[in-house]
């Protein structure tokens, strides 16, 4: 008779642990219905403070016109190209990442990590599943001793 009582208590603990692990969404009571909003009386808008006139701004002066530069004659097709004409256009230099110091292990930020991240402590096992397994283990242990 005592063995049956212990098994019943262990089964009750199993169901309680499963209900706690599943959270409040698994409760047998229905969710409360939303109440319709209560109509509130209209309120008066707040008083508007008088607006001061904008401060006077100084007049904008334009700089005097600058005389146009003298036109540069276009080079003829038969003329040899001058050193200025053959100079390449200025391009911004391409910056490369600094070289790592000798003996150091470095990884550029654009490269992907070479090894996968370590698994987390609870990877693949939900808390509710862990609680159910622990409760079943407790039931099995109690039943084995009696």
From Swiss-Prot:
Keywords: Glycoprotein, GPI-anchor, Hydroxylation, Lipoprotein, Membrane, Proteoglycan, Signal, Vacuole. Proteoglycan that seems to be implicated in diverse developmental roles such as differentiation, cell-cell recognition, embryogenesis and programmed cell death. The lineage of its organism: Eukaryota, Viridiplantae, Streptophyta, Embryophyta, Tracheophyta. The gene is AGP1. This is Arabinogalactan protein 1. Residues 75-89 have a biased composition (Low complexity). Residues 121-146 form a propeptide. Residues 21-128 are annotated as: Disordered. The keyword Thylakoid does not apply. The keyword Kinase does not apply. A lipid is attached at residue 120 (GPI-anchor amidated serine).
